[in-house]
Amino acid sequence: MKDFVVITFYKFFDFPDYKERQQPIFNFADEQKIIGTILLAHEGINATIAGTQTALDAMVNFLHQDPRLADLTYKVSTAPKQPFKRLKVKLKQEIVTLGQPNVDPNNTVGTYIDPKDWNDLIQNPDVTLVDTRNDYEVGIGTFKGAINPNTKSFREFPDYVAENLDPQKNAKVAMFCTGGIRCEKATSYLLNQGFQEVYHLKGGILKYLEEIPVAESLWEGECFVFDERVTVKHGLETGHYELCYACGHPIDAEDKTSAAYEIGVSCPYCIEALTPERRSRFEAKWQQRQQMKACQAS
C-alpha cells in the first residue's frame, strides 16, 4: 500500500472574508476526498491535510486562484497510514493562538534562517536559543542547548518572555517550532517588546529534518506532529511514539513497560489522576473501540 501524502501550509494575510470562504474550501477538499484540518481566521490560513498527490495538487491550485494565496507554499511528507479521521474546516479567532491582538506577523517578524545556516547560528555563544513549543513536545525532542520555557500552551509564551528574557541581556534570540507558524508570532512579539535581533528557523523543525543529514544534525530525539503519526524523525519518517488513549500524551516503548501503563486506561503521565470513576470510563471506552474495530474488520 502506498503511503498517504501529507502537506502543511500557512500564511498570514488580511482575510476579512474568511467566513464566506469556509464552505467553498470545505466543498472542494471534500470532493477531492482530502482529510485533515484547515483553520481560517481574519489573520490568515493554517492547514495540515492528507490525500492522494493528485488531490492535494488540485487543492493547492484551487487555493492559488485566490490572488492573496497565489504565493502559498507548502511542506510535503508521508504517513504509512491514514493520518486523520475526517476533514475539518474551522473558523478561529487566530490561526495559532497567542492571545496578543497587537501581534501581526504581516507588519513585524523576525529574520528567517534557512535550515542550512541554522547550525552556525545556534552554536554562536551569544545567541539565546528558545523552543517555543509546549513542554510535552520539547520532552520528545529538541535542538541541543535549547531552552524549554515549560509552557502548557502557546498562550503562556508571553509570560515566559516577561519573566525570563531581557532585551539588554539577551541581545540575540533564535527560536524554532514545528512548522514555523508559532515563531511568526513569537518573533513578532519579541520585536514588539524591544528585542533587537530575533531569528527563527524557516520552515520549522520539519524543514530542518527534511533537509539536514543526520550526521550534520543538532536535533536530538523526534518531533511531535498533530496527526496520527504522533512523531517524525529525520527524513520525516514516522517516529516511534503513540498516544496514550486515556490522556493523549505521547508515549514510547519504555513508557509502555512502566507499571503505570495499562492499555486504554493509563500511562506514566496520567496515572496520578486516575480515579475509580475514570478507570471505569476509560475501560468502557476502550472496549467499545475494540468492538468497533472488530465490526469494521468483519
From Swiss-Prot:
Fetch the HAMAP family from UniProt. TrhO
GO MF = oxidoreductase activity, acting on paired donors, with incorporation or reduction of molecular oxygen
PROSITE patterns tied to this protein = RHODANESE_3
Please list the GO biological process terms of this entry.
Answer: tRNA modification
Instruction: Return the similarity comment.
Output: Belongs to the TrhO family.
Catalysed conversion reaction: uridine(34) in tRNA + AH2 + O2 = 5-hydroxyuridine(34) in tRNA + A + H2O
Q: Which residues form the Rhodanese domain?
A: 123-217
Q: Please state the Enzyme Commission number of this protein.
A: 1.14.-.-
Designated name of the protein? tRNA uridine(34) hydroxylase
| Enzyme active site | 177
Keywords of the record: Oxidoreductase, tRNA processing
Q: Which Pfam families match?
A: Rhodanese, UPF0176_N
- Give disulfide pairs as residue numbers: none
Say which domain of life the source belongs to: Bacteria
Q: Which InterPro entries match?
A: Rhodanese-like_dom (IPR001763), Rhodanese-like_dom_sf (IPR036873), TrhO (IPR020936), TRHO_N (IPR040503)
Question: What organism is this sequence from?
Answer: Picosynechococcus sp. (strain ATCC 27264 / PCC 7002 / PR-6) (Agmenellum quadruplicatum)
